[in-house]
A protein has these predicted regions:
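A structural signal for short, well-ordered beta-strand segments and their strand-loop junctions
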Residues: 6, 33-38, 136-138, 173-175, ...
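Histidine-anchored nucleotide/phosphate-binding helix
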Residues: 18-28, 160-163
Length: 269
């Protein structure tokens, strides 16, 4: 076949979902088959697409290898439409905007949403999830310390301000790679500290009613997969630090409450 579409899957889980979503949308747009290779790129952040073949990527078609594909590279960081070639095409880039699958939101959400089996299991494990105003808080610290001038870290002041925007909540679910820091700096009465595989944490996060997210594609996808029509989502106004891309406006969603934050020495507050 000479009309296939594929993409390089690279980065963490959130990055890879963006890349796959863009490829799938191009396939639907041009009525072409989309295939993926589990190890199509040198992994960053220690994430292999093969980790997700049986869960988040269970609805994708994987093949052992692809040959004869022409690479089409993403343009500037902000959204810019890129078109597949008339023959086999592999997209290369990050494609971090829902504009890359505009018109196919429902299909994309269905493709990557939690399985019914997972939902049943997680409600049994965390019955608090069924409460009316559950809140997820994502606090990313560990890997950001290596390059805070690229990936700045949202501190406790940001979380406290975001809590004021959220208002009332019944139970908090904390998702963090530094739970000890959270316990020392933020106090909650009804709280669960989630510690599980990354894809399970993302899915569990998506089942919370409301979200305090950070500048992370991981929490981006958790909020997108949330089907609560009245969900509240708070995000920081700064996504990258001074050494990162600055034209990132297209990653923001219209239904977010964007909290104006300040950048100082790698911190967002």
């Amino acid at each position: 076949m000479n009309n296939l579409i594929s993409c390089n899957l690279m980065g963490g889980l959130g990055n890879q979902i963006f890349q796959a979503a863009h490829a799938l949308a191009e396939g639907m747009k041009y009525n072409r088959e989309v295939v993926f290779v589990p190890q199509s790129w040198t992994p960053m952040q220690g994430r292999q697409a093969s980790n997700y073949v049986n869960n988040v990527f269970r609805n994708l078609k994987f093949v052992d290898s692809i040959d004869g594909f022409e690479k089409v590279t993403e343009g500037p960081w902000e959204y810019s439409d890129v078109f597949p070639k008339d023959h086999n095409t592999v997209f290369d880039g990050y494609f971090q905007s829902s504009k890359n699958f505009l018109g196919f939101d429902d299909e994309i959400r269905k493709t990557f949403s939690p399985s019914e089996e997972f939902i049943t299991e997680v409600y049994e494990k965390y019955p608090e999830l069924k409460q009316e105003n559950t809140l997820s808080i994502h606090i990313r610290r560990g890997d950001c310390f290596m390059n805070p001038d690229i990936h700045p870290i949202a501190n406790e002041k940001y979380v406290e301000r975001a809590l004021n925007e959220i208002g009332e909540y019944t139970h908090v679910f904390i998702f963090s790679d530094d739970k000890n820091w959270v316990k020392e700096n933020l106090k909650f009465e009804n709280v669960t500290y989630v510690d599980d595989e990354d894809y399970k944490e993302m899915w569990l996060m998506s089942l919370c009613k409301n979200h305090i997210m950070v500048n992370s594609t991981f929490s981006w996808w958790a909020t997108f997969l949330n089907t609560n029509a009245n969900k509240k989502i708070v995000a920081p106004s700064i996504w990258f630090g001074p050494r990162g891309p600055q034209n990132y406006k297209d990653i923001y969603e219209s239904n977010w409450t964007v909290l104006d934050v300040k950048y100082e020495d790698g911190w967002l507050s």
